[in-house]
Amino acid sequence: YITLEMAEEKIAERIDANLLNVNIQDITDLPKPMFDSRVTNLAQKTQGSLIIKEYPTASAHSGHFRALLQDLFLKKSFTPDIIFIDYLNICASSRYKAGSNVNSYSYIKAIAEELRGLAVETNLPIVSATQTTRSGFGSSDVDLTDTSESFGLPATADLMFALISTEELEGLNQIMVKQLKNRYNDPTINKRFVVGIDRSKMRLYDCEQSAQNDILDNGQEEEYNADEKKLKKSFEGFKY
């Protein structure tokens, strides 16, 4: 996990709250015996390694990340399965110097291309984030044109989705995910779906299927017939 925004310790607190099932504001007050017990129980379920590395905002680019991966491999024999970068727009570019006379479209596009190149080179998925424009910030139906600063970013990404929150969804402790671009599959399949969110524990979780029924896309609505064990599509009655 590479962060250019929050401190390493704050990122670790969020992950601890998720794994230990404790409200994030209670992490520092958790009694040591309870902490040890939860860590022991967690270790029995799963094993893994997480490296959190902080860089100053707008100071690190793909070259720094490549050097970090090489350093971890040589000194700790550590090779990640996935890389999270928080977040793309505040990375630097290895091709453009900071303060150079370059527009935001070209600069952000260059960062996206460099990170994608790093992903291809290392054969690792890289997940990052961006923000929306002001008009997209309050929108309940975000699309690719709402990407802030540079449309070159969605042009470069392989998979892109939006996290959408409204007052109604907040009341249900849910967040909507909308596929904006998908090079690996048909983006109209499960184009919109909701997941549960527990902000106090920094956790996402699956929702019941009934929660998905209200957001099915037109033309994609399907009804599952349990008796016949088949999917009946809403356009089944069409005649050719």
Region spans (language model):
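Helical mechanochemical/support elements of P-loop NTPase systems and associated helical scaffolds
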Residues: A7-I11, P31-F35, H61-F65, F84, ...
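Flexible beta-alpha connector loops of hexameric P-loop NTPases
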Residues: I24-P31, K53-S59, S93-K109, G136-T145
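Helical hairpin unit composed of two closely spaced alpha helices linked by a short loop
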Residues: P80-I126
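Conserved H-loop
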Residues: L4-M6, S128-Q131
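Structural motif
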Residues: I51-I52, D81-F84, F161
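Cytosolic-facing regulatory segments adjacent to core modules
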Residues: Y1-T79, T147, R192-F193
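Flexible glycine-/small-residue-rich
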Residues: T3, E54-P56, Y87, Q179-K181, ...
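C-terminal regions of RecA-like/P-loop NTPase motor modules
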Residues: N21, A43, G63-P80, K97-G99, ...
